[in-house]
């Protein structure tokens, strides 16, 4: 169950700094060159729940897992991302303790557009009925090596699914 009182950013309508957006775009372009989705998380001050001002890239382990065991991991990093969930959970706890919570989990899509796929939804829910973390989710579209779109998604309790949420980009402060 989403706890919007303690984690209001999970409702979306966030404000990303221009520097954060540019870094996410750069990570997406670089990952495109490696033929894999970028992934990581975005953080911000707990005292300003809507503000997102930090980027923490993570390694997409999908290609490595596919090479090790293609039967268990049939998809490659081009259409899927896999992060170290234990490291991610540690970062969530650390962010809460230090007043710089994880607010957004981000990843890119290669040559297919910015949408929240059924796979994205299943990964976000981690096999449960709803996501275990109160986060928003940013998907960046990269086509031909160029970022052409991005969309923010949040969990909607009443719909029992993910819906698009608006977000703003802060030019300067």
Feature roles, as predicted:
Residues 103-109:
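Active-site neighborhood of phospho(di)ester-bond hydrolases with catalytic His/Asp-centered motifs
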Residues 1-102, 113-173:
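Conserved beta-strand-loop surface patch within small alpha/beta domains used
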């Amino acid at each position: 169950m989403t706890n919007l009182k303690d984690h209001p950013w999970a409702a979306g309508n966030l404000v990303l700094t221009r520097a954060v957006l540019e870094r996410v775009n750069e990570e997406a372009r670089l990952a495109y060159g490696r033929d894999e989705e970028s992934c990581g998380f975005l953080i911000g001050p707990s005292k300003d729940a809507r503000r997102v001002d930090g980027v923490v890239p993570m390694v997409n382990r999908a290609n490595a897992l596919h090479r090790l065991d293609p039967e268990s991991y049939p998809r490659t990093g081009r259409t899927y991302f896999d992060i170290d969930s234990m490291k991610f959970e540690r970062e969530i706890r650390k962010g809460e303790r230090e007043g710089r919570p994880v607010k957004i989990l981000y990843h890119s899509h290669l040559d297919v557009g910015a949408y929240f796929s059924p796979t994205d939804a299943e990964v976000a829910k981690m096999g449960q009925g709803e996501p275990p973390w109160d986060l928003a989710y940013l998907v960046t579209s990269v086509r031909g090596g160029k970022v052409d779109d991005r969309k923010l998604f949040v969990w909607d309790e009443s719909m029992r699914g993910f819906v698009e949420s608006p977000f703003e980009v802060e030019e300067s402060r």
